[in-house]
Amino acid sequence: MRPSPPRFGWLLLPLLLAGCGTVKSPTEPPPEGPGTGTAFTFAQIQREIFTPTCAKAGCHDAASASEGLVLEAGVSYGLLVGHPSSEHGSLNRVEPGSPERSYLILKLRGDPSITGQRMPLDGPPYLTPEQIEGIAAWIRAGAPND
């Protein structure tokens, strides 16, 4: 004889299903930082984009300093913000408040007006549109050294 299932077992089903997955609170702040399309700090850009992607041997490390640009922590900010581009003299590498006048953004987007190639040089993959927009948002906010 086959045992019969418990008569009230179906009452437990909604409780079990309710425990699956997580529900985010509507008051939980959205994520920020590289890859999210929101402005982030220069420290985040350095740590999550410049150091692992750009400050490599043969590129923008201190030994190579391609186009006179070093993107290593501690020196990159001073060589970017308000510093003239060596490839496009009428533009600064980063023009605070103006991503469309910042050569860095043009290079990251692969704009037709750039000299040379789109960055990073070993792309694709290049930076995501969200990462580029995050850097642009930082520039739009005045490119603070935070």
Regions found by a protein language model. Give the residues of each.
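C-terminal motif of bacterial Sec signal peptides marking the signal peptidase cleavage site
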Residues: 17-19
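Solvent-exposed helix-loop boundary motif
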Residues: 21-38, 43-47, 51-129, 133
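Flexible coil segments in periplasmic/lumen-exposed cytochrome c-class electron-transfer proteins
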Residues: 129, 141-146
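Bacterial N-terminal signal peptides that target proteins for export
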Residues: 1-11
